[in-house]
């Protein structure tokens, strides 16, 4: 039985690298996984996912996945979503449909909360509906476990 996974972590915890490695592992075993990201993620261009360590791969947009008929989605062995915090409720509902009705695993990677520790919309719904929730751990610049993100400007940390 397929499951919906939400793997979250602070910035710099290798979420994107993990997503790319999972897709590679599927491909290496002769399986077909699709990488997707929301259109609001423009960091690396429209149809590419890149990690800070230099890994990259083509992807589709979640919005394209929304338009895809179920029969085409059934051609995938796994759906892997990067930057899932930027998804909206209906997109997360689509992931639930893919898992529950099409029996295809969906693995979502993203931030849990913003710099004010407020949940992103996509993360909120993934935390509510995911079958498996996993934290990807990393270390903060201070040496302790990284649990949240900070936003900086020329004067230091922004708190509002």
Q: What does each model-identified segment do?
A:
Residues 1-71, 114-125, 135-138, 147:
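Conserved P-loop
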């Amino acid at each position: 039985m397929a499951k919906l996974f939400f793997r979250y972590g602070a910035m710099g915890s290798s979420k994107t690298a993990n997503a790319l490695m999972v897709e590679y592992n599927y491909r290496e075993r002769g399986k077909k996984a699709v990488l997707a990201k929301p259109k609001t993620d423009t960091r690396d261009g429209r149809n590419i996912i890149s990690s800070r360590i230099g890994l990259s791969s083509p992807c589709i947009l979640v919005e394209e996945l929304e338009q895809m008929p179920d029969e085409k989605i059934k051609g995938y062995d796994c759906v892997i979503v990067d930057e899932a915090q930027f998804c909206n409720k209906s997109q997360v509902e689509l992931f639930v449909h893919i898992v529950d009705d099409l029996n295809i695993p969906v693995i979502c990677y993203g931030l849990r909360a913003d710099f004010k520790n407020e949940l992103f919309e996509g993360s909120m719904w993934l935390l509510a509906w995911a079958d498996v929730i996993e934290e990807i751990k990393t270390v903060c610049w201070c040496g302790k476990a990284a649990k949240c993100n900070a936003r900086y400007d020329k004067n230091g940390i922004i708190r509002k």
